[in-house]
């Protein structure tokens, strides 16, 4: 059996997913593609998936009989409509973040999925599938350091694009930490405050960089998250969790250590693609496997997408107010209580 996938959006991430579906992963093939740029869609299909039909829009693709599952990798504001259409058609859907650009939009997807009666949505929070984060999760579940007390995270990029704005430090960058820490700690966020350190000379006039986000969970864990998107030296992701009995940290990315000319060191990655390439493979294979077995989606859920959106909204509000802001979430529906895969299952 093969899961026949229709891909909406053939930009950079869409192309990456088409390539991995066709060339790296098992149990799936790309049978349909669409993009607002039809010439690009045809070019991508001809390059990676010659058998795929190019459709004029997402609705035609979703309705196609040879599409079992939908992968949404289009412009963020278009995600909600595509996901809702896929749910209406009863087709499972993998949606790159954001699930929707508003918390209300995410809730509409949650409600539509619950009305359908089966988990069909997986959100593209790939860090949950990264081997390093899986090791952290396993260590926490085995209580190797006791109860978590504090978390320190770092998210650094070489430089930001001219279009990158201060709020995007939350909605585009910190959103990954928001989700993965919610999953790691199995705890809900309660309060947030955002601090602005001295601004780097490398940031454009409209951008505040770096930023420091302080999150507090309902269990009292304090999270210090640094976002520095013009650090210049490389792409650097770190996470350290201090518990009652010890400290655990995200392992370093394996790299050759070079000793030469009186210096010793390793290469620093320059972008996110290499850092999380394997995680992208694993998350999409999990989505395919769920489809092959006709089981509910086991990856990050629509509810997780909603939690991330509500938390991000509060963080942006804290950016603007300069004060501590509350993060208020309704009770998690029973529909989503026991749906996430454990590290052993992934």
Curated annotation (Swiss-Prot):
InterPro entries: Gfo-Idh-MocA_inositol_DH, Gfo/Idh/MocA-like_OxRdtase_C, Gfo/Idh/MocA-like_OxRdtase_N, MI/DCI_dehydrogenase, NAD(P)-bd_dom_sf. Residues 322-331 have a biased composition (Basic and acidic residues). GO terms for biological process: inositol catabolic process. Keywords: NAD, Oxidoreductase. Gene3D superfamilies: Dihydrodipicolinate Reductase, domain 2, NAD(P)-binding Rossmann-like Domain. Pathway: Polyol metabolism; myo-inositol degradation into acetyl-CoA; acetyl-CoA from myo-inositol: step 1/7. Residues 322-346 are annotated as: Disordered. It catalyses: myo-inositol + NAD(+) = scyllo-inosose + NADH + H(+); 1D-chiro-inositol + NAD(+) = scyllo-inosine + NADH + H(+). Its EC number is 1.1.1.18, 1.1.1.369. It holds the Pfam family GFO_IDH_MocA. It is an enzyme of class 1 (oxidoreductase). One of its GO terms (molecular function) is nucleotide binding. PANTHER family: INOSITOL 2-DEHYDROGENASE (PTHR43593:SF1), PTHR43593. Involved in the oxidation of myo-inositol (MI) and D-chiro-inositol (DCI) to 2-keto-myo-inositol (2KMI or 2-inosose) and 1-keto-D-chiro-inositol (1KDCI), respectively. Belongs to the Gfo/Idh/MocA family. Homotetramer. This is Inositol 2-dehydrogenase/D-chiro-inositol 3-dehydrogenase. It comes from Shouchella clausii (strain KSM-K16) (Alkalihalobacillus clausii). The gene is iolG.
């Amino acid at each position: 059996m093969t899961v026949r996938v229709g891909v909406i959006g053939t930009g950079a991430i869409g192309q990456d997913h088409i390539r991995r579906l066709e060339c790296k992963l098992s149990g799936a093939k790309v049978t349909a593609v669409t993009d607002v740029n039809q010439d690009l869609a045809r070019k991508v299909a001809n390059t990676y998936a010659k058998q795929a039909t190019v459709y004029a829009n997402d609705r035609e693709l979703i309705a196609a009989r040879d599409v079992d599952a939908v992968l949404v990798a289009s412009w963020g504001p278009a995600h909600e409509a595509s996901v809702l259409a896929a749910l209406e058609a009863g087709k499972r859907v993998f949606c790159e973040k954001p699930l929707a650009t508003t918390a209300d939009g995410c809730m509409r997807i949650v409600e539509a999925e619950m009305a359908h009666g089966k988990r069909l949505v997986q959100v593209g929070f790939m860090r949950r599938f990264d081997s390093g984060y899986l090791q952290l999760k396993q260590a926490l579940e085995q209580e190797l350091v006791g109860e978590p007390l504090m978390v320190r995270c770092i998210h650094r990029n070489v430089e930001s694009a001219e279009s990158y704005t201060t709020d995007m430090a939350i909605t585009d960058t910190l959103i990954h930490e928001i989700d993965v820490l919610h999953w790691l700690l199995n705890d809900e966020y309660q309060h947030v405050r955002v601090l602005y350190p001295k601004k780097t000379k490398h940031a454009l006039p409209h951008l505040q960089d770096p930023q420091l986000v302080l999150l507090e969970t309902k269990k009292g864990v304090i999270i210090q998250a640094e976002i520095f998107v013009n650090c210049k030296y490389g792409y650097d992701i770190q996470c350290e969790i201090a518990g009652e009995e010890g400290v655990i940290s995200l392992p370093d990315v394996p790299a050759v250590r070079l000793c030469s000319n009186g210096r010793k060191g390793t290469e620093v990655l320059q972008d996110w693609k290499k850092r999380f390439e394997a995680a992208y493979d694993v998350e999409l294979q999990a989505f395919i496997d769920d489809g092959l077995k006709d089981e509910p989606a086991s990856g990050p859920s629509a509810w997780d997408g909603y939690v991330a959106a509500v938390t991000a909204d509060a963080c942006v509000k804290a950016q603007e107010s300069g004060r501590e802001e509350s993060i208020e979430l309704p009770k998690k529906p029973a529909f989503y209580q026991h749906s996430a895969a454990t590290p052993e299952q992934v």
